[in-house]
Amino acid sequence: MLSLVSSEGYINLIERRVDVAIRAGSLHDSALRARHLFDSRLKLVAAPNYLARCGTPETVADLAQHTLIGFTEPKTLNDWPFADSGNTPYPAVPHLVANSGETIRQLCLTGNGIACLSDFTVATDIASGRLCELLPGCALNAAKPFHAVYYSDNAVSPKIRVFVDFLAERLGGQKED
């Protein structure tokens, strides 16, 4: 049986009986095996109707005058890698929060504010004009790694290995020996 669980929060694979999780950002649990899948840059985006109604920010400091959409957890997802000068990420204080990147994307698409989302999530929306990229010249050079993680034991199930190999091949990672 295949069961998919969607969560932006940290889950304990053993407690939840999860075979494989996709994690974004730095990995902290050394008890897990990890396979790099791809890197993704973050982009600030808003819908054209939001920008027509509220104006387009011209600097990172201007974001303080806008409705920001962010994550409930982890809070580090609200440290946006954008700066007018220096390398300090912008500490976004969201007016709307959600626990799902897809929910945040939908809130953004419907003109509810500005969000910071992974480029793989919003690339099609930007290309089609449904979302506008904001302040690309202020982006810090920070790509977020995405990994498949799974419990580390001596005998990884062949099904898990094949699935992780498939993800890595499909998403651009390297095949594990």
Located regions from the model:
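C-terminal effector-binding regulatory domain of bacterial HTH transcription factors
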Residues: 123-128, 138-177
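Solvent-exposed beta-strand sheet faces enriched in polar/charged residues
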Residues: 3-7, 134, 149
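Secondary-structure junction motif
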Residues: 64-86
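Hydrophobic hinge/microswitch elements
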Residues: 89-134, 139-141, 150
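Flexible hinge/capping segments at coil-to-helix
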Residues: 31-42, 46-68
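Short, well-ordered beta-strand core segments
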Residues: 19-21, 43, 68, 115
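Central regulatory/effector-binding core of bacterial HTH transcription factors
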Residues: 1-33
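Alpha-helical segments flanking ligand/cofactor-binding loops in enzyme cores
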Residues: 35, 61, 105-106, 161
